[in-house]
A protein has these predicted regions:
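Bacterial Sec-dependent N-terminal signal peptides
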Residues: 1-24, 171, 376-378, 693
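Terminal processing/anchoring signals of secreted or surface-associated proteins
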Residues: 19, 597-602, 611-614, 642, ...
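Carboxylate-rich, polar loop motifs that coordinate divalent cations or form catalytic acidic clusters
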Residues: 20-609, 644
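Short, conserved beta-strand segments of beta-strand-rich sandwich/propeller modules, principally
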Residues: 581, 668-673
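Glycine-centered coil/turn sites that cap beta-strands in beta-rich domains
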Residues: 603-636, 654-657
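Short, glycine-anchored, charge-dense loop/turn motifs used at functional sites
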Residues: 634-645, 664, 672
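Glycine-centered tight-turn motifs at strand-turn-strand junctions
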Residues: 644-667, 678-682
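C-terminal tail/sorting-segment detector
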Residues: 673-693
């Protein structure tokens, strides 16, 4: 099936069942730091950078980005090429999906090759053209694509990995490192392998995709030393005249995101990865998003450090010194001040120890870091016999000798979480089937075994997760644990009594049987975030779930099929406490969703409660949002003479109104009062909304 999508009507025509308003609520954050292919197309130049596409228009200087929250069908672009005959950019994705993008933003999705069931490797290596037809060189042969409508015309299984193709003198040539050069007359049956003639030799394709001349405009397009797009003209003497200093869309330095943090109105992320099964070896990166621009921390070199600078795994912020940040990594503990590198703590200059027998500094595993309120930094130094350590605010180190952490084994300890209710630091051991949950009283150096490797649920059934990933707390004092067996939690009673008791929340089937199912049982759950409405955002290996406050209702299940989520493998989710944004760190990058919940206020006043948009103009048909409310506030919207037009309860500190009355009809022009009552019964008018029709 082919879907034609224009920028103007994209929110109406879909590949999926995305709602108009829901689509608007997504943002995809793509990196554009590494330009790999440049495709001039007249006055517009398309660029592939860090597996994402952007364009630059020479007539007005407009920079346009393209992503899955906009017109694109997928993420992870591997190749682009401009089809002159059809005036479309062929966009090939790493999963073999294909988009055809025009200069004005129209997109034809051609998913047939991507959807084709086959045991063959469908990797596309190169794109070549013969009129309106694109020949896609694949790992098994050649695919012929009509670039006018996205139809797959033919598939030629040559039984070899084709590096590139070209048409010459009535023949289609396929160059293969394995079998040499293959050719077939275009007038012959190319589906018949016997018509393909093998020639000796293989010619390596020599093309510089980042230094390209546009045959039409005679302009040269290239990238600057710092990775930006630029173009220039050559005069008769070969002198270059540059037309721009360099173009690069706003974006993070890479698409590597693993853990997310909110601090002082900014979003921070570390981009490393490590587990017993996955050794990321990803560059040491800290991304910073201030809501408008991206920046990143200084990256020390291996020469500076004497070891690799890879796989940043966690971070925390000094409560006593603004801008002072500590980052835990696979290769030690990194100190930064205002984004500048200060020092790396490793086995040479601290009690941190290497996890390997040869004492390699590349594996001084700092897998959890957390400041306590007094400014002491607690560090989990994984895969050694004394993994819990503390760097005092005076600069002195201490090693905590807790018998539960030293007996008979080493530990893959991670995810330090400071509970606001209990004052303990919670962390997990995720050492395959030997998982453990710990609560540490850091004030008195007491470690409590909170369960594992087996746990007992409320029905006295035994649970033995293969992994534990993450710990957090909800607004009712429940300690939630993300595990390979699904989400588990300890009630305040479970926390007090210990003994490995957990709750697997039971969701009623509501089918008259009084039966219930465990919430996301055996769904690999990697992270749980609690928003202002006490709802649970659950990151899994099959997308993101939003679960209601009482955990009985699945409000959303976002996947790559029904949302702009870049990947169904979601490592982390962050509900920003300073806004209604929810951020998702996935296997293929970062995105965010504008939810309908914000952090509630303890007290509602006319100074901290407001509505937007306000006034509501005639052309606006979306939701009107009231923010600054208290938790679970009873909200009524009334006319100036007291007639009720809408009512409900806040989600966290927010309430959404569609601008309609109780009968579903848009309200008349006028001033509407927002009356709110807290759970204890205190009430009053907290703000006013002007509606203009």
């Amino acid at each position: 099936m082919k879907a034609i999508i224009s920028l103007a009507i994209f929110l109406m025509a879909t590949l999926t069942a995305w709602a108009d308003s829901a689509k608007d609520r997504w943002t995809v954050y793509q990196s554009y730091s590494n330009i790999t292919e440049i495709e001039p197309a007249g006055t517009v130049c398309f660029v592939l950078a860090s597996n994402s596409v952007f364009s630059y228009d020479t007539t007005d200087g407009l920079v346009q980005t393209y992503d899955k929250a906009g017109v694109m069908s997928d993420v992870g672009v591997s190749h682009i090429a401009w089809a002159k005959a059809s005036k479309r950019l062929v966009v090939v994705y790493t999963n073999s999906n294909i988009d055809l993008l025009s200069a004005n933003g129209d997109v034809i999705n051609a998913p047939d090759f991507y959807l084709k069931t086959t045991t063959l490797d469908k990797t596309i290596n190169h794109i070549d053209f013969d009129g309106p037809y694109a020949y896609l060189s694949t790992a098994f042969g050649v695919v012929k694509l009509n670039t006018r409508d996205g139809a797959i015309m033919d598939t030629y299984d040559l039984g070899t990995n084709v590096s590139y193709t070209y048409v010459k003198n009535g023949y289609l040539y396929a160059e293969s490192k394995e079998r040499g050069r293959l050719r077939c007359k275009l007038t012959d049956n190319l589906l018949d392998k016997s018509n393909w003639v093998r020639e000796d030799g293989f010619t390596t394709l020599r093309e510089d995709r980042t230094n390209v001349q546009d045959a039409q405009t005679k302009l040269w397009w290239t990238k600057t030393a710092d990775g930006k797009l630029t173009y220039y003209a050559l005069d008769a003497d070969g002198k270059r005249t540059y037309m721009t200093e360099g173009v690069q869309p706003e974006g993070p330095v890479s698409n590597n995101f693993y853990r997310l943090y909110a601090h002082n109105g900014k979003i921070y992320a570390v981009g490393g990865m490590w587990s017993q099964e996955t050794n990321g070896n990803l560059p040491g990166e800290v991304h910073v998003w201030d809501g408008t621009t991206w920046s990143h921390f200084e990256q020390p070199t291996a020469e500076q450090l004497g070891h690799k600078n890879v796989d940043y795994l966690c971070m925390d912020f000094d409560p006593l010194k603004e801008g002072h940040v500590m980052v835990g990594a696979k290769s030690g503990l990194y100190e930064f001040q205002d984004g500048k590198f200060v020092k790396c703590y490793n086995s040479n200059n601290s009690p941190l120890e290497s996890a390997t027998a040869d004492k390699s500094k590349n594996y001084v595993m700092a897998t959890g870091v957390k400041y306590d309120p007094t400014g002491n930094l607690w560090v989990l130094n994984s895969h050694i016999t004394n993994p819990l350590k503390m760097l005092g605010k005076d600069g002195e180190w201490s090693v905590m000798n807790n018998i539960e952490l030293t007996k008979d084994k080493t530990w893959d300890v991670k995810e330090l979480f400071l509970s606001p209710t209990y004052g303990y630091m919670w962390f997990v051991n995720s050492y395959w089937e030997e998982t453990k949950l710990f609560a540490y009283d850091y004030k008195n150096n007491k470690l409590y075994d909170a369960g594992g490797p087996t746990y007992t649920n409320e029905d006295y059934a035994t649970i033995k997760p293969y992994y534990l990933f993450h710990v957090t707390e909800d607004k009712n004092g429940n300690i939630w644990v993300a595990s390979s067996a699904g989400p588990l939690y300890l009630t305040p009673s479970d926390v007090k009594n210990g003994g490995g008791l957990v709750t697997q929340h039971k969701v009623p089937r509501n089918d008259g049987t009084n039966l219930a199912d465990y919430l996301l049982s055996n769904v690999e759950t990697r992270c749980i975030a609690v928003d202002g409405g006490n709802r649970k955002w659950i990151a899994t290996s099959s997308g993101v779930f939003l679960i209601s406050d009482d955990c009985n209702t699945q409000i959303e299940h976002f996947t790559t099929d029904n949302s702009p989520l870049p990947s169904n493998t979601v490592y982390y989710v962050l509900a920003d406490p300073n806004s209604n944004m929810v951020y998702f760190a996935t296997e293929k990058g970062l995105c965010s969703y504008q939810s309908d919940a914000t952090t509630p206020n303890e007290k509602m006043t006319k100074d901290n409660v407001y509505a937007y948009p306000n006034p509501v103009t005639p052309d606006y048909t979306g939701y009107i949002t009231v923010v600054g409310l208290s938790y679970n506030a009873d909200v009524k919207i009334v006319t100036s003479n007291g007639t009720l037009v809408n009512q409900g309860r806040s989600t966290g500190g927010s309430y959404r109104w569609n601008g309609c009355d109780l009968k579903g009809k848009r309200v008349a022009s006028g001033i509407y009062m927002v009356e709110a009552a807290t759970e204890d019964g205190s009430k009053g008018t907290v703000c006013k909304i002007a509606v203009i029709n």
